[in-house]
């Protein structure tokens, strides 16, 4: 099966909200703690080895990377790689910059149609993960969580991580959050959950295609 995400290429890098590209195509943002495997997951989803780069120093990257998706002449969407968060040794000024950049982008970017939130399956729903949800959830747009590195868990541990994370996400619905909050297991190494993630992301980028597939055929 050919995936739209496999037609991805670097587009631009920005460090301030004023530099965000004036595009009209839908965007999907990828967020997660430093060392949650975000860059690796993006590369696997896009079937490329070096599309998204992970800094050798956790927490060093402070900018937003854009990747265009679709035909090079007429891209149909953008993937947006947000800075990793949660590394303790990052200076306070850098943390403040990240917080402003991430919270403002998530809350105000009209092109943004959904958030892919990476959580280490061994340590899901940290305080900072919850903060990301709370910044974005008021928009009513969907959040899909990838519980990364699930290959490091036993089968029972994976089941428990999935169940407990879904329970934590359901609590936001009880608080009145309108957008969909979903979760799945994911392993870039073992390619666990890859097809499921592909299908969900592409349904966000190409809802008209998904709608057409779901419509009954006229007799």
From Swiss-Prot:
GO terms for biological process: division septum assembly. CDD domains: YihA_EngB (cd01876). InterPro entries: G_ENGB_dom, GTP-bd, GTP-bd_ribosome_bio_YsxC, P-loop_NTPase. GTP binds at residues 32-39, 59-63, 81-84, 148-151, 186-188. SUPFAM superfamilies: P-loop containing nucleoside triphosphate hydrolases. The keyword Cell division applies. Its cofactor is Mg(2+). Keywords: Cell cycle, Cell division, GTP-binding, Magnesium, Metal-binding, Nucleotide-binding, Septation. The keyword Transmembrane does not apply. One of its GO terms (cellular component) is cytosol. Necessary for normal cell division and for the maintenance of normal septation. Belongs to the TRAFAC class TrmE-Era-EngA-EngB-Septin-like GTPase superfamily. EngB GTPase family. This is Probable GTP-binding protein EngB. It comes from Burkholderia cenocepacia (strain HI2424).
């Amino acid at each position: 099966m050919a995936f739209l995400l496999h037609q991805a290429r670097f587009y631009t890098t920005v460090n301030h909200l004023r530099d965000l590209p004036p595009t009209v195509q839908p965007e999907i943002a990828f967020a997660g703690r430093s060392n949650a495997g975000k860059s690796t997951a993006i590369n696997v989803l896009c079937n490329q080895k070096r599309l998204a780069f992970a800094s050798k120093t956790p927490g060093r990257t402070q900018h937003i990377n854009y990747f265009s998706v679709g035909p090079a002449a007429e891209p149909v969407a953008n993937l947006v790689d947000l800075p990793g968060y949660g590394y303790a040794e990052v200076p306070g000024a850098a943390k403040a910059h990240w917080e402003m950049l991430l919270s403002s982008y998530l809350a105000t970017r009209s092109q943004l149609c959904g958030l892919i939130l990476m959580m280490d399956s061994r340590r899901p729903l940290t305080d900072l993960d919850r903060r990301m949800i709370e910044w974005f959830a008021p928009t009513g747009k969907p959040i899909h969580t990838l519980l990364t590195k699930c290959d490091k868990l036993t089968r029972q541990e994976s089941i428990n991580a999935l169940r407990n994370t879904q329970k934590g996400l359901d609590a936001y619905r009880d608080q009145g959050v309108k957008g969909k909050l979903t979760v799945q297991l994911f392993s870039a190494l073992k390619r666990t959950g890859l097809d499921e993630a592909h299908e969900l992301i592409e349904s966000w980028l190409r809802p008209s295609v998904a709608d057409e597939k779901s419509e009954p055929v006229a007799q």
